[in-house]
């Protein structure tokens, strides 16, 4: 259009806890295990990584976020759902960090576009496995080297288009 436009863009993914049958039946355990970490626009789902897993998930975007959520209740609302999330209704996320309960990844971008301007945001969802001796980069810090390399491989539109054509 000929006028500047302001809009809010939200992303959302609900992480599994690595075992679909257990995820849907063992609520007492599941609601006490969820763990996440946020570094800039990357949300790391690291449930049980320290104790018994050698893998984690990462949900990222290639642009700086305005806000984020990692708690389903914070993003969707206690009695809400993905059809009409509370964060979207409010126009922003609350920067929640999930400790147990239902970990999610949600990004919020507040954008202003000049007339005729286009903006691309790349979202990625990845799964990372680390050898046991390489699980941590420092005591208690998950080794993010493989995740960072993956995010760097898909950081631009051209990189994503090239990867898609190679499929």
Regions found by a protein language model. Name each.
Residues 1-4, 102-103, 114:
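A conserved hydrophobic secondary-structure block that centers on an alpha-helix together
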Residues 5, 111-129:
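Short Pro-Gly-centered flexible turn/kink motifs
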Residues 59-61, 107, 125:
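Short beta-strand element of the conserved SAM-dependent methyltransferase core
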Residues 2-90, 132-167:
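Polysaccharide-binding surfaces and accessory modules of carbohydrate-active proteins
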Residues 100-103, 165-167:
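Substrate-binding groove/exosite segments of carbohydrate-active enzymes
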Residues 89-101:
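Active-site-adjacent bridging/hinge elements
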Residues 76-81, 100-102, 126:
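Glycine-centered flexibility motif
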Residues 95-98, 108-113:
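Beta-strand-rich interaction surfaces with strong enrichment in secreted/lumenal proteins
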């Amino acid at each position: 259009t000929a006028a500047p436009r302001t809009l809010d863009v939200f992303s959302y993914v609900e992480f599994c806890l690595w075992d679909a049958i257990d995820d849907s039946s063992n609520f007492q355990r599941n609601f006490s295990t969820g763990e996440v970490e946020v570094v800039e626009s990357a949300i790391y789902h690291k449930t049980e990584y320290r104790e018994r897993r050698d893998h984690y998930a990462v949900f990222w975007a290639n642009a700086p976020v305005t806000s984020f959520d990692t708690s389903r209740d914070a993003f969707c609302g206690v009695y809400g759902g993905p059809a009409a999330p509370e964060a979207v209704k409010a126009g922003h996320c609350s920067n929640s960090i999930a400790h147990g309960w239902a970990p999610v990844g949600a990004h919020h971008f507040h954008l202003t576009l000049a007339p005729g301007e286009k903006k691309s945001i790349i979202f990625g969802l990845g799964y990372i496995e680390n050898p046991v001796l390489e699980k941590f980069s420092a005591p208690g810090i998950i080794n993010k080297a493989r995740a960072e390399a993956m995010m760097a491989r898909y950081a631009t539109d051209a990189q994503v288009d090239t990867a898609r054509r190679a499929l």
